[in-house]
Amino acid sequence: DYCGPQRYTAVPDRLYRNRGDGTFVDVTAEAGVTSEYGPALGVVAADFNMDGWVDVYVANDGEPNQLWINQQDGRFENGALLAGVALNNNGSAEASMGLDAADFDADGDDDLFMTHITTETNTLYINNGFGLFDDRSARVGLGPTSLAYTGFGTGWIDIDNDGWLDLVIANGAVKTEEALLRANDPYPLHQRNQLYANLGNGRFEEASKRGGSVFERSEVSRGAAFGDVDNDGDIDVVMTNNNGPARLL
């Protein structure tokens, strides 16, 4: 088993401002981002409330998440609870790990997707255009099919080049009892990765079986990175695995 976040003391996140010359200065204290913190495993920056200023979202493992709203004067305030992204739809903090933001529904604002531990669904928060969010994980088809998995790396990418952003999730268990292991399974933490196809109507379907043999393989995946590795015009995926080789998709 891997040690959970309760074994460690959380420390405040840090914010570094780019000086514009390739160097950075620590502005954590003056920015006000030390007032609330948790065991953070994911971070993403975007203009969530559409005011022209970049905000910062932090995903915490087992504690409420933070949405640092840019106050336009160098300071940030945590607006996660008011915005509806501190907790899930049931009012519970989840084991947030993998995280990405994108305009998956093409309505002009960035939405949030994050992965969680086995028995917790992955979560999709849909932005209303003013920085308020609605947890629609179950309604869009991303809930029940994720319950058996522990997700780490994730990303929005258009896998099939149909103009709609799909989801790739790198999975791997952290506890043997969460791995739903079979009798005498020599690799109890291994899980298969997942691919969700965006249907273009606000809903998703799991398309892992159509994604090829890489989504049939079971490993202890912990991270994913995305880019056009071979310069052929489409997005490739690199997944890292504990006690195993990285995979290039």
Question: What are the functions of these language-model segments?
Answer:
Residues 1-249:
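Acidic, glycine/proline-rich Ca2+-coordinating loop motifs
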